[in-house]
Amino acid sequence: MKKDLIAIGKIHGTHGVKGNLKFEIFVKNFYLPEEIYIKDEENELQPLNIETVDRKKGLIKFKNYDTPEKAKEISHRLIYVPEDLLPKLGEDEFYEFQLIGMDVYYNDKLIGKVEKIDDRLSQAYLIIKCTDEKTRHLPFINEFVKDVNVKENKMQITPPEGWFSL
């Protein structure tokens, strides 16, 4: 895969009889360009031109995919776009894809990896798969997350007392 392409969403199954597909975007406030990429069966990037998008309904339609059968050929694939199309972030702001898989350190000792981000509540939580095989949740706030280094793919944390005994 080209290094400058980033997975920003996913195409799910077909919807209706006109070739529409259900989809989701992982990046907030991002508008899809006219051309996106998916990986084909050989894991090669394939460009697709968007015909219509309905973000409220979560539906997308691509040019030359006019039937459910044709649309099914590209269902259940990640959506890739060039990284330079992503909105620029401020200091101490990160895209979720930058944090997933990041090494987590406490007192300079590797304690796990970020497995995912849960932002369904009033604040975001890091879901960390620790080296002791336990999965722990940590509020993604400055009090506990001391440093995030995207280039080195690591973060330093200072979890609350008792966090390791959970």
Swiss-Prot record:
Subunit structure: Binds ribosomal protein uS19.
InterPro entries xrefs: PRC_barrel-like_sf, PRC_RimM, RimM, RimM_N, RimM_N_sf, Transl_B-barrel_sf
Positions of the PRC barrel domain: 91-163
Single Gene Ontology BP annotation: rRNA processing
Domain comment in the entry: The PRC barrel domain binds ribosomal protein uS19.
Compartment list: Cytoplasm
Any GO molecular function: ribosome binding
Keywords, ordered alphabetically: Chaperone, Cytoplasm, Ribosome biogenesis, rRNA processing
Job of this protein: An accessory protein needed during the final step in the assembly of 30S ribosomal subunit, possibly for assembly of the head region. Essential for efficient processing of 16S rRNA. May be needed both before and after RbfA during the maturation of 16S rRNA. It has affinity for free ribosomal 30S subunits but not for 70S ribosomes.
Protein name: Ribosome maturation factor RimM
Family classification: Belongs to the RimM family.
Gene3D superfamilies found in the cross-reference section: PRC-barrel domain, RimM
Cysteine disulfide partners in this protein: none
Annotated GO CC locations: cytoplasm; ribosome
